């Protein structure tokens, strides 16, 4: 047979008909319900195996890219093939039931014989579809088919708005039984079908012990033509397409608009489907892997085969079921005859219908249905199974015939529970645990082996509210371990301590209320409070309520009084009765005892008076009694009443408590979720009471979340990536953190290893940044890690994409509830925002919102900000500041609020919304409050829609994907886009240049700077000029530049500071992820490299590392080709890796990466000495060639060549520094070659900036190596270049760069006076140029010079500016260096600018900061300075702690001032420790001293150390020598240090040297507590400024290094 081609008009009625069988579409039914019809036909039941397992595989998938859409594609690929076969053979698909379908061939009885043959042929062809195929998800799809024939009844039932139908009869039972007998790839005929078929045509085999038979194959007679046979059969099929419609699969495709028929058919289709019926992408739109609750209801009848008997019962049951579902927001998805009985598949949580307390609703609904249906006449047994979890909800089938259905293990489980546990309501463990209902509402059931269910877990019978309340069930419940600390809740506990103090010293009641959303840890706070509240004469009563408590009158007070009276521990009512009698005998007449019967479940005789009393009067009598009892107790004890989940306090209990706090002194502490509805008047009165303290609980702070993760994993340390993911994802909510952690453990992506010290770790690229977040030391000491050797660290398995991880079901469910409660327009905005990412701009959102105007978007955004879906921020700094700290807890003064006039409240709300709209307009950044909401909303998009949206975003962002106007709009990797063509938009570069010109920007190639000429002679610095004259000329030039910058009307300085960081965050980062989502890996790689380069510019090594790892994954996916663009990307990748390694001080790794990059850039660096000297010779000739102006004849390099040359200069600039670190003799030649290659490469670029940088590097290299003539020459050449520059734009920046670099060079060489002169000018330039990073560097270098030169007034002024920069720009380096200098002032200058405690607090607070942690120099200096402080105080335990931390950072060698400052401080600490060892006559003191002296000598000998550090190093060497008794060497080193200090102008060191020299050679001994006495008298800077302390007297506050005698010999 030929497969017909499908073509039809897509009217709405056709789309509705696609959800229904022909039996309904063409049926003519009476409007009365129930309605019965009878006919004959053949039934086919097809059961498809493998789909449930596939659903489970997708629902438990780690990543968001394996969603429902892929699943529905796979499902429908297979199911549509079956549907097509059925339709081709004339069948009518009656129902889809998950992964099964029921088809009907409706014909006259006399035609059954031939039609059965057709159906068998169809069945065999269906098997043929699946026989040899192994499907794409690795799942083997197979089918089982049962056939039956005979008399069939149809029942139509429903109400005015909804209709359902069932097929009933022996044939229906037979087809189900036949399918159950079938094995994979079998076709089973029911006994009746076998009787009615043409037996001569079928080869069968018998089924053991059954009358049914199995079909082997058809055996038609010779010359039998099946096509002709089938054509004859189609004449008996009333709705088989023929004639002009013969190419259609289904005649219903030809339906024309018919309002009456359409209205009739709509009743059979779910409302959520009808809402979307106009959406032509309906099939995918409603397809989700979604957490839902399944309620499977089975009704068994006394006589199932008689439709007229069971019809009315089904109608009655349906009417009640649908009314109850409407109340609880559930829907009937399917109704069908299931084995024995009629089954209703009800679902809670369909798309758009997710509500809170879904599980409770489902159970209550199930119980209601059970109770009602059990009473319906003709219904023999009611069985209900309830299961919760992720299932596939979506449209399954073929384009012309499909249905909305649910598939998944939980659907199967609910069905099996319903059949294996008849006559009761059962539920699974997920429903039991998630309902939060009391345990006594359930009873655990014995396990049964259920078909198709491997492991059901514990199953429960749901009783509902039929059991009596049991005492002792209301105690506080918390899963926290006893020794588990309460993290991050000090503020909340302080509120309690303060209120408790008020309660104890006053004679009035106090109420403390903690309000917080679920998951914030309210129960843990109460558990801690219960422990802290314990004391003499304190009576603590703690109870926990639940949803049911709210509906039980006086329940809270019942539990309270049961505890007060000691009844909660009584095991029998008689014991309770005796206790009660003893307690109330003096307070209550015996005839009133029976008042206590109902409330305390006792059995006192009922008196006549009480029997006549009204319920209200009984309640009042009880309250009077309870008040009397409490009045007696409070005289002897302080009552503290703790209530968890107080939102469930019933109104009667609220009234009693309100009266209680007015009458007696009692302390009530409650935790509660925000009230959904307005609370009762008594509750409001309690909240507004003058003695009520109402606290809204905030989130836990990031540091505490980090500690929680370590404690929960039982490790001492976690990776930064894991910490960031859990910290950001949890939003500081403990429950979210726990769920995310469980999700990671479930997917087995966490790896645990034994702790390894930093020194022993063999550093590779993959472990460069591991184990960065440690458990807070105090917690480490008091909790889980007593055995240091057994400490573990946790990191992630390689290749895990945390950004794409699908959220845990529990958190997804919370987000779906929020989404489904929104208006459709709000949902659409949230979903569009989710495509952009966690953070987005209003401009981009407006671009992708379909058909919205700006006013509408702003109004919707304001509403969503008010609803805590979004936060809004004015700029990136505001956002980053907010991300560092979660919203803390705060107190709400409801009493004050209630006293305000209520007039104009509505007006006030409108005004507030308008203000919010204005705020949104001003804000540049919007961010999801909860990352899980963004992920959940993102997953709701279809794949094609998602791609289209990502493409839209990418096109919009692409135009701005470059550096800011301040930085002249370049690439972060110079000339990157000229080398790699990654643009989506058709705009060519010429057009862009024209646009740039029209906006007043000069393109890069137009700048004068690009063509740099090498001056022919020293026009500016004639040879006869002295160094002093040259110095004067340089300083005057910088002064001239500064004057012009300050006074010129020209556009010399930028109007705003650098915005590159903003652009990186809101343009380039999202753009890379959009390309990644689009599968454009080459474009994504381009932007990941740009991002890594940008982060390196911003000194964020960790983030650069992370994005290079992202790039590495993409590099592996790209097809290997030899194109220059791909080679350049690889070279850039390795050069950036080299930069990261260099910045981290991993110089061996850096060298390897940089060499590899140079090789790819066609600039091979030699590996052996022969090649080395050959290269040196070649580079010398090249340099001679450039210097002699021969190179100027060649045209400027092209843009691609420039990109290559710029990369080479970066690599070579780092390489010469790396080789300079080495003590090996031949390495100086490698360093010389590298710096020469850098200079020649820079000259080839013909770019002034590159040439100047290279000259200054060449000068510094020779300066450090001691070649005076060479370094001076190239420094002068660099200066000659800047004299030629136009003083605007980049020219000004080059001048500032030269000034700053000269400051570094002069400082490191020890020319402090000149460094100060240059530094003050460089500082002013960078301040005017508004570049925070450069500004910071100039402040640091100048402050270091001023400190060494002891110019304290100027130093304090510079430190003030450094502090201002750190605060206004949120600049962590500035703050860290500020405190580093403050520690130096404390240790060496003799006064206090910031206290030691403040400096220490900064270290504790920021040592795990992402940027600071991976900047080894500053932390090394801070740790070492603190270690020195403790060594001077002889607090050796603290010394070891900080010294060891510093020691771990020593291997990270970087050629920075901070690193060498840090290492000199570290060595000083070790020298002080040596003094301790010698004093204590330690065995290894001699060896330690010798090793220390050797290390100090090596540091002095190393070129890169710089002469400025030599006075301190010689000073320390002198001290080591005097400690070891070598007076001669000590004198030599002292004199060298003094001479160098004098030459350099290092007054700080010179004074200290003289004082120590005098002390060492004097006969007087120093006091043991010398430093302690000194720090107690250290003056503050304020005292010095006020003139109360003479600045000259500060010298006496310097620490004197202790040495006993000069002739101390070992």
Swiss-Prot record:
Cofactor binding, note field: Binds 2 magnesium ions per subunit. Is also active with manganese (in vitro).
Enzyme Commission (EC) number: 4.6.1.1
According to the record, the protein's activity is controlled as follows: Activated by manganese or magnesium ions. In the presence of magnesium ions, the enzyme is activated by bicarbonate. In the presence of manganese ions, the enzyme is inhibited by bicarbonate. In the absence of magnesium and bicarbonate, the enzyme is weakly activated by calcium. Calcium mildly increases the enzyme activity, also in the presence of magnesium ions.
Q: Where does hydrogencarbonate bind?
A: 95, 167, 176, 337
An annotated GO BP: positive regulation of reactive oxygen species biosynthetic process
Which disease annotation does the entry carry? Hypercalciuria absorptive 2: A common type of hypercalciuria, a condition characterized by excessive urinary calcium excretion. Absorptive hypercalciuria is due to gastrointestinal hyperabsorption of calcium and is a frequent cause of calcium oxalate nephrolithiasis.
Entry keywords, A to Z = ATP-binding, cAMP biosynthesis, Cell membrane, Cell projection, Cytoplasm, Cytoskeleton, Lyase, Magnesium, Manganese, Membrane, Metal-binding, Mitochondrion, Nucleotide-binding, Nucleus, Repeat
What is the name of the gene encoding this protein? ADCY10
Its needed co-factors are: Mg(2+); Mn(2+)
The protein's name in its UniProt record: Adenylate cyclase type 10
């Amino acid at each position: 047979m030929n497969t017909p081609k499908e073509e039809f008009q897509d009217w709405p009625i056709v789309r509705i008909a696609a959800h229904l069988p022909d039996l309904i579409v063409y049926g003519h039914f009476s409007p009365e319900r129930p309605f019965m019809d009878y006919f004959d036909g053949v039934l086919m039941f097809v059961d498809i195996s493998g789909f449930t397992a596939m659903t489970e595989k997708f629902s438990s998938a780690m990543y968001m890219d394996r969603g429902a859409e892929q699943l529905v594609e796979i499902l429908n690929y297979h199911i549509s093939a079956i549907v097509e076969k059925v339709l081709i053979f004339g069948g009518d698909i009656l129902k889809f039931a998950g992964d099964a379908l029921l088809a009907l061939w409706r014909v006259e009885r006399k035609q059954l014989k031939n039609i059965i043959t057709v159906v068998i042929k169809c069945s065999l062809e269906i098997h043929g579809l699946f026989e040899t195929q192994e499907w794409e998800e690795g799942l083997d799809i197979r089918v089982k088919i049962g056939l039956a024939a005979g008399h069939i009844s149809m029942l139509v039932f429903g109400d005015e708005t909804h209709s359902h139908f069932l097929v009933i009869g022996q044939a229906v039972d037979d087809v189900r039984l036949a399918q159950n007998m079938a094995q994979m790839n079998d076709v089973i005929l029911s006994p009746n079908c076998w009787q009615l078929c043409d037996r001569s045509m079928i080869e069968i085999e018998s089924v053991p012990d059954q009358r049914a038979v199995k079909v082997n194959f058809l055996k038609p007679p010779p010359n039998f033509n099946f096509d002709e046979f089938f054509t004859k059969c189609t004449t008996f099929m009333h709705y088989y397409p023929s004639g002009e419609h013969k190419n259609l699969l289904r005649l219903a495709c030809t339906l024309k608009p018919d309002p009456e028929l359409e209205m009739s058919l709509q009743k059979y289709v779910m409302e959520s489907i009808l809402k979307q019926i106009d959406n032509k992408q309906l099939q995918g739109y409603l397809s989700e892997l979604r957490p839902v609750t399944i309620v499977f209801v089975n009704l068994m009848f006394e006589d199932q085969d008689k439709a007229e008997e069971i019809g009315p019962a089904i109608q009655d049951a349906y009417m009640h079921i649908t009314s109850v579902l409407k109340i609880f927001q559930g829907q009937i998805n399917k109704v069908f005859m299931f084995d024995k009985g009629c089954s209703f598949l009800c679902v809670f949580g369909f798309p758009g219908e997710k509500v809170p307390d879904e599980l409770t609703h489902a159970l209550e609904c199930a119980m209601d249905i059970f109770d009602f249906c059990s009473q319906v006449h003709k219904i023999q047994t009611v069985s209900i199974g309830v299961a919760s979890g992720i299932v596939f909800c979506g449209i399954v089938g073929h384009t012309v015939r499909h249905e909305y259905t649910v598939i998944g293990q939980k659907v199967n489980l609910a069905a099996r529970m319903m059949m294996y546990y008849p006559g009761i309501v059962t539920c699974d463990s997920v429903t039991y645990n998630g309902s939060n209902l009391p345990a006594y509402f359930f009873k655990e059931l014995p396990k049964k082996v259920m078909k198709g269910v491997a492991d059901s877990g514990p199953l429960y019978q749901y009783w509902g509210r039929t059991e009596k309340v049991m005492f002792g069930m209301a105690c506080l419940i918390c899963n926290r371990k006893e020794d588990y600390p309460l993290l991050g809740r000090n503020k909340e506990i302080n509120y309690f301590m303060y209120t408790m103090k008020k309660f104890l010293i006053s004679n009035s009641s106090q109420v403390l209320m903690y309000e917080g959303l679920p998951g914030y840890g309210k129960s843990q706070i109460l558990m801690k409070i219960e422990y802290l509240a314990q004391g003499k004469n304190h009576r603590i009563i703690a109870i926990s309520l639940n949803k049911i408590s709210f509906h039980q009158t006086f329940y809270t007070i019942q539990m309270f009084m049961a505890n007060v009276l000691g009844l909660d521990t009584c095991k029998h009512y008689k014991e309770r009765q005796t206790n009660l009698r003893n307690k109330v005998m003096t307070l209550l007449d015996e005839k009133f005892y029976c008042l206590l019967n109902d409330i305390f479940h006792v059995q006192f005789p009922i008196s006549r008076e009480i029997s006549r009393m009204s319920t209200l009067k009984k309640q009042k009598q009880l309250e009077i009694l309870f008040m009397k009892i409490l009045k007696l107790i409070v005289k002897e004890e302080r009552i503290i009443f703790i209530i968890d989940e107080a939102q469930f306090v019933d109104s009667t209990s609220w009234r009693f408590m309100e009266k209680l706090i007015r009458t007696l002194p009692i302390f009530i502490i409650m935790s509660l979720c925000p009230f959904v509805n307005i609370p009762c008047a008594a509750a409001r009165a309690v909240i507004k009471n003058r003695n009520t303290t109402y606290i809204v609980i905030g989130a836990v702070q990031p540091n505490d979340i980090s500690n929680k993760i370590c404690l929960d994993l039982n490790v001492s340390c976690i990776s930064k990536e894991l910490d960031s993911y859990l910290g950001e994802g949890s939003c500081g909510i403990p429950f979210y953190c726990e769920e995310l952690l469980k999700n990671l453990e479930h997917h087995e992506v966490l790896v645990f290893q034994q702790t390894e010290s930093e020194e022993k770790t063999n550093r590779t690229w993959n472990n460069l940044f591991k184990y960065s977040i440690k458990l807070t030391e105090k917690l480490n000491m008091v909790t889980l890690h007593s055995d240091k050797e057994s400490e573990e660290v946790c990191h992630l398995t390689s290749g895990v994409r945390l950004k794409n991880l699908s959220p845990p079901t529990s958190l997804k469910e919370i987000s779906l509830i929020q989404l489904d409660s929104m208006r459709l327009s709000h949902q659409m905005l949230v979903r569009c925002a989710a495509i952009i990412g966690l953070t987005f701009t209003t401009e981009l959102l407006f671009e992708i919102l379909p058909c919205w105007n700006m006013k509408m978007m702003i109004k919707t955004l304001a509403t969503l900000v008010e609803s805590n879906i979004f936060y809004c921020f004015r700029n990136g700094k505001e956002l980053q500041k907010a991300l560092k700290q979660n919203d803390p807890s705060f107190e709400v003064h409801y009493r004050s609020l209630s006293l305000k006039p209520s007039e104009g409240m509505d007006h006030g709300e409108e005004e507030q919304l308008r203000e919010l709209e204005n705020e949104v307009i001003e804000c540049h950044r919007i961010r999801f409050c909860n990352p899980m909401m963004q992920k959940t909303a993102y997953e709701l998009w279809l794949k094609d829609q998602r791609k289209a949206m990502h493409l839209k975003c990418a096109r919009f962002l692409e135009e701005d994907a470059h550096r800011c106007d301040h930085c002249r709009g370049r690439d972060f990797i110079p000339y990157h886009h000229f080398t790699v063509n990654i643009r989506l938009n058709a705009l060519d570069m010429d057009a862009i240049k024209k646009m740039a010109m029209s906006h007043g920007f000069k393109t890069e190639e137009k700048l004068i700077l690009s063509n740099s000429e090498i001056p022919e002679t020293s026009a500016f610095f004639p040879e006869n000029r002295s160094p002093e004259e040259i110095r004067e000329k340089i300083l005057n030039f910088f002064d001239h530049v500064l004057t012009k910058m300050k006074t010129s009307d020209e556009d010399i300085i930028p109007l705003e500071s650098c915005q590159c960081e903003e652009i990186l965050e809101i343009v380039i980062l999202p753009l890379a992820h959009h390309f990644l989502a689009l599968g454009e890996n080459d474009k994504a790689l381009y932007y990941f490299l740009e991002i890594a380069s940008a982060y390196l510019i911003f000194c964020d090594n960790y983030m650069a590392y992370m994005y290079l790892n992202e790039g590495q994954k993409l590099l592996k996916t790209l097809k290997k080709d030899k194109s220059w663009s791909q080679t350049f990307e690889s070279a850039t990748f390795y050069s950036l890796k080299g930069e990261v390694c260099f910045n981290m001080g991993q110089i061996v790794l850096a060298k390897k990466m940089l060499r590899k990059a140079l090789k790819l850039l066609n600039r091979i660096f030699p590996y052996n000495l022969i090649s080395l000297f050959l290269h040196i010779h070649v580079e010398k000739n090249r340099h001679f060639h450039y210097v002699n102006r021969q190179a100027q004849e060649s045209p400027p390099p092209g843009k691609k060549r420039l990109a290559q040359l710029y990369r080479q200069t970066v690599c070579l600039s780092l390489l010469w520094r790396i080789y300079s670190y080495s003590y090996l003799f031949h390495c100086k030649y490698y360093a010389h070659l590298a710096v020469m290659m850098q200079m020649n490469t820079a000259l080839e670029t013909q770019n002034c900036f590159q040439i100047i940088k290279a000259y200054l590097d060449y000068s510094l290299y020779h300066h450090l190596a001691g070649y005076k003539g060479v370094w001076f020459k190239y420094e002068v050449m660099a200066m000659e270049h800047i004299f030629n520059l136009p003083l605007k734009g980049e020219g000004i920046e080059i001048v500032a760069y030269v000034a700053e670099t000269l400051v570094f060079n002069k400082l490191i060489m020890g020319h402090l006076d000149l460094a100060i002169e240059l530094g003050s000018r460089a500082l002013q330039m960078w301040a005017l140029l508004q570049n925070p990073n450069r500004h910071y560097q100039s402040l640091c270098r100048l402050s270091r010079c001023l400190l060494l030169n002891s110019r304290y007034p100027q130093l304090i002024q510079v430190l003030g500016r450094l502090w201002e920069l750190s605060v206004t720009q949120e600049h962590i380096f500035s703050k860290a260096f500020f405190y580093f200098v403050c520690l130096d002032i404390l240790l060496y200058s003799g006064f206090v600018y910031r206290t030691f405690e403040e400096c220490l607090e900064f270290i504790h607070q920021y040592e795990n900061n992402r940027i600071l942690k991976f900047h080894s120099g500053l932390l090394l200096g801070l740790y070492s300075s603190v270690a020195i402080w403790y060594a001077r105080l002889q607090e050796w335990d603290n010394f070891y702690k900080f010294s060891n931390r510093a020691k771990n950072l020593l291997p990270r060698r970087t050629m920075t001032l901070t690193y060498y400052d840090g290492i000199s401080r570290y060595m000083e600490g070790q020298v002080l420790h040596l003094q301790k060892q010698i004093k204590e006559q330690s065995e290894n003191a001699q060896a330690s001293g010798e090793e220390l002296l050797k290390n100090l000598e090596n540091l002095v000998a190393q070129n890169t150390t710089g002469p400025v550090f030599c006075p301190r190093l010689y000073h320390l060497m002198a001290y080591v020598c005097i400690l070891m008794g070598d007076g001669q060497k000590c004198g030599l080193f002292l004199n060298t240090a003094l001479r160098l200090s004098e030459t350099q102008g290092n007054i700080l060191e010179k004074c200290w040297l003289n004082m120590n020299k005098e002390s060492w050679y004097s006969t007087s001994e120093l006091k043991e507590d010398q430093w302690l006495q000194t720090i107690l008298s250290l003056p503050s800077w304020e005292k010095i400024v006020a003139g109360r302390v003479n600045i000259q007297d500060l010298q006496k506050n310097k620490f004197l290094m202790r040495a006993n005698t000069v002739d101390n010999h070992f």
